[in-house]
Amino acid sequence: HEVFNMDDKILEGTTTVGITCKDGVVFASERRASMGNLVAHKVAEKIFKINDHIVTTIAGSVGDAQNLMKIIEAEVSLYQMRNNDKMSVKAAASVTANILRSGPMYVQTLLGGMDGDKPSLYSLDPAGGMIEDTYISTGSGSIVAYGVLEDRYHEEITTDEGLEIAVRAIKA
């Protein structure tokens, strides 16, 4: 299990979750790679730091996820080099949606981070659909995780509280 927030705090937790907080964005995921009843790998990376203000998570095909992460990292880096400015979180989510629309990738992605002092979080489906929300869960355990998120989330949540809720949602 892995929990990551924009302050590089790493803890152990279970399922893919993103939570916007008044002072940041918190991400959590299980670390097991599975296909149905088969556990393919016990320690799979599912949270990726794209740059110093954008993080993404993946649920789905490992190969597609690794490919998608490389493309997103390249697009964000190219933008920064060409424009001498950081790509916004919303722009990175839009680029990711466009990539997903261009071909079938069997992944569901959370992408979020901070633009200045504004936290934002997006869910991207395999067809490139993009939805912004304050908290999101993906993967097979998301139904149970949403129960915790809906019960505990509030607008003034801090990243410390968000970490606690993310771990609870993952372990639910």
Feature map (PLM): residue ranges:
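Short arginine-rich
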Residues: 169-172
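Conserved short S/T/G-enriched processing/targeting/catalytic segments and their helical context
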Residues: 1-105, 131, 136, 142-164
